[in-house]
Amino acid sequence: MYPGRAKPTYNNQQAQQAQSQVGYQTGYSNAQPQQQYYTAPQQQNVSGSSMSFQHQFYPPPNQSPPQYNTGQYARPAAPPPGQQNYRNDIQQNHASGTVNGPSGYQQPQAMYKPPSQVQHTGPNNQVAYQYSQCTGRRKALLIGINYFGSANELRGCINDSHNMFNFLTQRYGYKAEDIVMLNDDTTDPVRVPTKANMLRAMQWLVKDARPNDALFFHYSGHGGQTEDLDGDEEDGMDDVIYPVDFQMAGHIVDDDMHAIMVSPLQPGVRLTALFDSCHSGTVLDLPYTYSTKGVIKEPNMWKDVGSSGLQAAMAYATGNTTSLVSSLGNVFTTITKSNNNVDRERVKQIKFSPADVIMFSGSKDNQTSADATENGQNTGAMSWAFLTVLSKQPQQSYLSLLQNMRAELSSKYTQKPQLSCSHEIDTNLQFLL
């Protein structure tokens, strides 16, 4: 039984069997969520291309996620493979150790493993960070929300999370008991992707993480934007994701996700995040964004920041709250322009992290992402591209992975996957998961 496919137990009482279910044996809280909005829904059998499971339809929120600039959330045709073909691809590549992908793929150039020693950046190389070797414990949080019954219902998000579960456990050695899935086809109250459950699961993901651990976060669902309040977004808008109960509990803002999943991490801890949602280019507020040529797209955020900015960055990296608050006061005084607008590029320096955080997102901040379907197997286009590229060619550099995902999508979609990082990276390093 996959996580999230537990027997219906949601009757406004505490879940009786949560302790014995996958993903909850490793410190994940089994307490009843603070906010409950659903009662036991009717069950309806739905058959997929190679599997059959029960969708539990939840009453929709009072309002759908906001309409995007392009109108209704698009569901164009796409070439996602069937479940059985996908599994065979993984097994064949895993067994054969295939390195080279299809002839049209970009092959990694001088790919090598990340260094184990501490790295330095910033003025006079005073700010330290560390790559993860991904040899420690592996944990994953997979969230897929279809928003059943709403005006902007999606069809592939839950499939995305199950496909990702198969991929992580079959190809990369993640253990089922170290994976938590939140889907809106379950009646287990602790597995419904409400805002409270999502925030709690994010905290579980990063709790007690140690150097060389590998954490994986996957979100497939609706994304949007709201007004930026801290000056860290170039377009003046914060990116958000939508829990199933967003109308009553609100959305989750990128600043909060950064504070929960990035800020607490030690140097040498890897967090790989994959967002298959609209307007997700900077959804984790990571300061470095890379182009398909392997160069930083943004100006150097350390330039002309001065001593106050450096002190703030170092305080952030070491968790020194008192020093951080003091330094930030000087930073904001320094970087406020004559027209009282904040220099956003300089504000970004407080988002630096000494941990090894990598994010692939399905689109730029001003783009939508596609929900695709073929032969009854629905999927998000970005999730499909990520799984397809790595199953065809398991050994990739960061640069070749980004290039090949874009190549997979370019013939059918306008969205452009993005690569963002918590620190500068050598994009020719081998991508580890």
Swiss-Prot record:
InterPro entries: Caspase-like_dom_sf, Metacaspase, Pept_C14_caspase. The keyword Acyltransferase does not apply. GO terms for molecular function: cysteine-type endopeptidase activity. Keywords: Apoptosis, Hydrolase, Protease, Thiol protease, Zymogen. GO terms for cellular component: cytoplasm. One of its GO terms (biological process) is proteolysis. The active site is at H222, C278. It comes from the Eukaryota. Residues 1-123 are annotated as: Disordered. Coiled coil: none annotated. Residues 45-55, 83-109 have a biased composition (Polar residues). It is an enzyme of class 3 (hydrolase). Its EC number is 3.4.22.-. Residues 9-44 have a biased composition (Low complexity). The keyword Ligase does not apply. Belongs to the peptidase C14B family. PANTHER family: METACASPASE-1 (PTHR48104:SF30), METACASPASE-4 (PTHR48104). Involved in cell death (apoptosis). This is Metacaspase-1. It comes from Kluyveromyces lactis (strain ATCC 8585 / CBS 2359 / DSM 70799 / NBRC 1267 / NRRL Y-1140 / WM37).
